[in-house]
Amino acid sequence: GEKSQEIIKATLKKLQDFGPDYWCGYSYSWFGNMKARAFDGEGAADALRTFAECFCLPNTFHANGDQTKSGKSKFTYRPFTLEGNFAFAAGIQEMLLQSHTGVIRVFPAVPVAWQDVSFDKLRAMGAFLVSAEKVAGQVRQVRILPEQGGTLRLAIPEGCKVASVTGNKGDKLEKEGVLILETEKDKTVTVQYN
């Protein structure tokens, strides 16, 4: 709820205010994930960009210390680890798709500059493969392939209206900004927005 969001935002601000002097590379990709979960696309992109630019070698290996010596961390060593790269990839997915609340949200934490963005078959909780497209800053289409079938809850993106739904089983219901549909196994549901 709203109170929880206030606590989360205050906690993230406190982490940032303390400063990252002794953060290592994966701390930035971890922080990017938290920013994405808090629906802060700008903050998520900034943290992930810092990870990629300052803590990865030209071959994309994560070197843990600030390789640019730009002050992003007092650690400048080079131990190779994998978790930072994995967290970076997870952070990108969290920016594009979230479903941990039981409601699928597309593009919940993308920066304003990402006006044209799409993804194909990212996995959401409930055994759904989700694809979506955003053009000129507006979500245009979401395609969902249910691997098991069942009830689908899809958040209607801010500023969008559902134009059409195909592939669902039975009626569609819109409730408090969420589209609720019944799905069949392996039958793609397509939602168009205008």
Residue ranges and their predicted role:
Residues 1-99, 103, 140:
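Active-site core of glycosidic bond-cleaving carbohydrate-active enzymes
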Residues 65, 162-182:
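Solvent-exposed beta-strand/loop surfaces of large extracellular or lumenal domains
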Residues 116, 126, 138, 148, ...:
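Residues that act as N-cap/strand-start positions at coil-to-secondary-structure junctions
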Residues 119-120, 142, 178-181:
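Beta-strand-rich interaction surfaces with strong enrichment in secreted/lumenal proteins
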Residues 144-159:
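Surface-exposed beta-strand/loop patches in extracellular or lumenal glycoproteins
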Residues 154, 175-194:
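C-terminal beta-strand-rich structural cap/linker in extracellular carbohydrate-active enzymes
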